[in-house]
């Protein structure tokens, strides 16, 4: 984040984002017994837990402008297991798009790290602006597309590959269980 801030201070138009896995998962996930850690092989790799609060600070301060997903789901059986015996053959990436909004809302807004307005900015408006789609996208306004997510912030669900409410992807695990 420091390099992004320094670049912007020099007048460089620098953009930085993060993904849910870096806010909620850490390198201990890659150290699970057996081959389970292969589920968490991604680029960049998961870091130590203390990095998560630094990323949340970056989101709060505007150093990180958006939260994407790098959604790249591979089934553990059949695909990730291709790397048994050869780390370089583990497909790089994991599922992320399906739980993004609830993770960021709960970890950010409910967790007291960001405001509801900042939540909307980092999950919708900022990306629309960066890609030149605003105000057609990324806002609720006359003349804008009605791309609306109806989200119940009070609903409680347990994220699980076995929960049909939280898991619709054709992948055999959920990184956030």
Tell what function each PLM region has.
Residues 12-16, 87-91, 139-141, 171-174:
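Short, structured secondary-structure boundary patches
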Residues 37-40, 61, 66-67, 73-151:
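His/Asp/Glu-enriched, well-ordered alpha-helical/loop segment
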Residues 39-50, 90-95, 170-177:
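A short acidic, glycine-rich active-site loop
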Residues 81-86, 145-177:
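C-terminal cap of metal-dependent C-N hydrolases
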Residues 26, 48, 103, 159-160:
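General structural signal for secondary-structure boundaries
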